[in-house]
Every structure is written in C-alpha cells, then in structure tokens.
A protein has these predicted regions:
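Glycan-recognition and catalytic cores of secretory/periplasmic carbohydrate-active enzymes
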Residues: 1-297
Length: 297
C-alpha cells in the first residue's frame, strides 16, 4: 500500500480497515517472518514485502542518530485514519483522468467510498499487484506528505530496537543490500553509546536521557541483535559481546532453583512482585528469546 509499513491489526473481518497506528515491533517481527519465508521459498514477493517494510521504518521511524522510534500514531487532525484515506476526486486530481481511473478501479476507490465515506486503497477485490502501480503509488505518497504529519512516539526502546537490528541483519543476508546492514550497525552503535554502561542496559531513551532500569527482554533481544550482526559480518566483537551480555542476563535474572528467568532483577524495588513470563504474545517472551540465544551460542 501507499508508503508501506504494517498497521497494528485489522478492525474488520475482511482486513480492509486497520487500526492505523504502526508499531516498531510489529514491523520488525514481520520483516523477520517475510525474510524467513523467502529463504524457504525463493518467492521474491516475500523479499519485496520485507524490503518495503524496512524502507518504511528507515524513512519514517528512524532518528538522525540511528535509533528507531517506537510508533507512528493513527490520528491526523484528530481523526483516526484521515492521513491514509482518499476521495475519488483527490485520486483523479493527483493522477489525472486516465491514470486516476485505472488506479481507482484496481484499488477499490469509489465516489461513495469504502470506509466511512472515504476510501482506503486496497486490493481485496483485485488480482493486480501493487508493483503494477509503483509510479502512481509514489505520486500519491508525495501528495499525502503535504497533509498534517502523524505524531511519532519518539521513545527509543532497546528491546524493540534490537528486534529491528536483528531484522535488518536478516534482510541484509537475504537481499545482500548493504544499506540494511549499515542501518543495523548504526542502530547498534546508538544503543551501545546511549543505553549501555558496560554490561548494564537501560530500557529506553528520550529527550537525551535514558531510563534507570532494565528488564529481561532488554537483554534477551539485544543478545539476539548482536548474534544476527555477527552472522552478517563475522565480526567476532559482536559474538563476544553477545556472550558477555548472556552471562550478565543469567547473573541478573536467572531463577537458579527452578530454572527460567524473572522479568526484573532482584535489585529493582519498584515491582511488588517479580513475574517469570513465558507466554509469547505480541512479541516473544524474554524466556523464549533467551532459550533461542542459548541454542545459538
């Protein structure tokens, strides 16, 4: 679709209307999934989807220092989805009569609208590929940029950034496009500079300040990121750092009696209880990721 990137979820059974907010972790995990399926099938549709998703993140959710922001809001001018919807008149005005009609027929754009009186461009009723309309998509993307900008949640979370670093490293190995590896390495340097003190990690960065605490997920995903960078570069520094942070995670979070890892270390007095999370929800649990890290190490 126009501008690329995945929204959080669909609000209807037909997958027409998304909740328009876009989260870093969703896009990172989906890049991993698409690259993995491409590796198994060699179907370039999957690699193309992964690359377009990465392009969205690098263009819309990346700080000047190389870290990745947390989310892009759903609302524009107080209306959810307004930034992403079009009228038929807009499409014709922007693309011209002939191109506008072709695009509208393919992408379900009507005078009546397919969503609350306006249109969400979609291919649910069409057999064409969006690549057939790359020129029109770019034109509409640049037209859309003149609208009120979407709010960015500009927190930089180490765990979500680590997911994105791992995804970009995988994407580099699938595509051999150096820009993805460069972005992954830049982000890791940002995290190392701003969210690491020795083997102590900090959860978040905002307004030139880091948080005070860290959790199992921060270590687990950061170790994964370092391992993926090692596999992409064969630079042993990444492997050695992964091993060091793995030992530190064991020291801080391990349940030495019953196995597994607690969410927080014993020095964190802000939590009245210290759960041991094993459920994989919107993101894999820290325990799952640590098990994966141990196997790879």
């Amino acid at each position: 679709h126009i501008g690329y990137g995945f929204s959080r979820y669909s609000t209807d059974r037909y997958f027409l209307a998304p909740h328009f907010e876009k989260m870093l972790y969703d896009n990172a995990l989906l890049i991993m999934a698409y690259v993995s399926v491409y590796g198994m099938t060699q179907n370039h549709l999957y690699l193309d989807t992964a690359e377009k998703t990465a392009q969205y993140v690098l263009r819309e959710m990346t700080s000047l220092d190389g870290g990745f922001y947390s989310a892009q809001d759903a609302d524009s001018e107080g209306i959810e989805g307004k930034y992403y919807t079009f009228t038929l008149t807009e499409i014709i005005d922007v693309l011209g009569e002939e191109r506008g009609k072709r695009f509208s027929e393919a992408f379900d754009i009507t005078e009546k609208g397919n969503f609350e009186g306006v249109n969400i461009p979609n291919l649910l009723k069409s057999n064409v590929l969006d690549a057939d309309f790359d020129g029109e998509m770019q034109t509409l993307y640049h037209y859309r940029k003149i609208r009120s900008k979407l709010h960015l949640d500009d927190k930089i979370l180490i765990s979500w950034n680590a997911m994105m670093i791992a995804s970009l490293s995988l994407l580099y190995r699938g595509s051999r496009n150096e820009k993805y590896l460069e972005a992954a390495m830049n982000a890791q340097r940002f995290l190392e500079k701003n969210l690491c003190e020795g083997l102590c990690l900090y959860t978040s960065w905002r307004g030139q300040k880091h948080s005070e605490n860290s959790f199992l997920d921060d270590y687990a995903f950061y170790i994964t990121a370092l391992l993926e960078l090692y596999h992409s570069t064969l630079n042993k520094d990444y492997l050695e750092k992964a091993e060091q942070f793995c030992r530190e995670a064991v020291r801080r979070f391990a349940d030495t009696v019953n196995g597994g890892f607690y969410l927080s270390d014993s020095n964190n007095s802000e939590l009245f209880m210290n759960p041991k999370e094993t459920y994989d929800g919107a993101v894999p649990s820290g325990n799952s990721v640590m098990a994966y890290n141990f196997v790879r190490l």
